[in-house]
């Protein structure tokens, strides 16, 4: 059994977790998350410099609380891991330097973890998670991707958003409608009072230069613009904006686009298991629609636990534990951080010559 201390500071959550595994059973001993939503809500989104400063302020206390709650002394930890890519560079640096400093101080191995692999690994804390190969829909504030996951974490990106990620579109539309930040939960809440069929919003596609459309890729910028034009038109007519109806219609279209393209991709590639992870995976409309539509194709859906959909260190620890199963992974203490790295290059974080 391995015990991992994991740190996540890629955006606006400061999180430390102690996790372990016994074979294929993964356990969370502690998972402390300090959110910065109140600090950023007044600006309508994350301010990178402010986020990095808050990580510096909060991380020592979050680390202490995680160790105390787990009742595991740091000397008993086998590996220390942190998110090193992708994310906000200043934020990543805080967590990475802290993790590598602890490794040096306590003579522990270090594992740099890809943030998206962390999200992907959140499913390991659910019951009966699938064995590879399977298709993952990773849908969050910064990313919307379809990833085929093979043995030993061989990953192939099959689809992605070419502009706004789904979560980013939720935030922008929420702000447009005068709702609180973050937009995802705010839209989901008010949409329950609305008519999801009231407005016929577009399901945008990406043109293929060879003709037709890219069938597994996403675009949410046009949908966001359509909502803007709708609001402008209603304002021009002097009518009251039906916020619940617009929110419900927007939420429905986002869910339909995600579900339709995910199921088509899984069906085309002969994959009978779909995993849904990331912050937007907490959306109830998306969860129910994915299960319902996948069932029609005899595809099984595995949903990340609600409390592990948004950024947290437990998922980073799970990714580290999964890597340790192969007994061949350790990152150099010279490994830096990077704002971007495609998920299919995650294995380079454990090579003798680090990618950054």
Swiss-Prot record:
Annotated EC: 2.3.1.234
Keyword Endoplasmic reticulum on entry: no
Chain residues that bind substrate: 138-142, 171, 184, 283
Binding residues annotated for Fe cation, in chain numbering: 115, 119, 311
Compartmental location: Cytoplasm
Molecular function terms, GO-annotated: iron ion binding; N(6)-L-threonylcarbamoyladenine synthase activity
Alphabetical GO biological process terms: tRNA threonylcarbamoyladenosine modification
One Pfam family of this chain: TsaD
GO cellular component, one term: cytoplasm
This protein's UniProt keywords: Acyltransferase, Cytoplasm, Iron, Metal-binding, Transferase, tRNA processing
Signal peptide: none
Main EC class the enzyme belongs to: transferase
Keyword Cytoplasm: yes
Cofactor binding, note field: Binds 1 Fe(2+) ion per subunit.
Cofactor(s), by name: Fe(2+)
CDD domains, per database record: ASKHA_NBD_TsaD_bac (cd24133)
Primary location class: cytoplasm
Catalytic activity: L-threonylcarbamoyladenylate + adenosine(37) in tRNA = N(6)-L-threonylcarbamoyladenosine(37) in tRNA + AMP + H(+)
Function statement: Required for the formation of a threonylcarbamoyl group on adenosine at position 37 (t(6)A37) in tRNAs that read codons beginning with adenine. Is involved in the transfer of the threonylcarbamoyl moiety of threonylcarbamoyl-AMP (TC-AMP) to the N6 group of A37, together with TsaE and TsaB. TsaD likely plays a direct catalytic role in this reaction.
PANTHER family (alphabetical): TRNA N6-ADENOSINE THREONYLCARBAMOYLTRANSFERASE (PTHR11735), TRNA N6-ADENOSINE THREONYLCARBAMOYLTRANSFERASE, MITOCHONDRIAL (PTHR11735:SF6)
Family the UniProt entry places it in: Belongs to the KAE1 / TsaD family.
UniProt protein name: tRNA N6-adenosine threonylcarbamoyltransferase
Native source species: Prochlorococcus marinus subsp. pastoris (strain CCMP1986 / NIES-2087 / MED4)
Name of the gene this protein is made from: tsaD
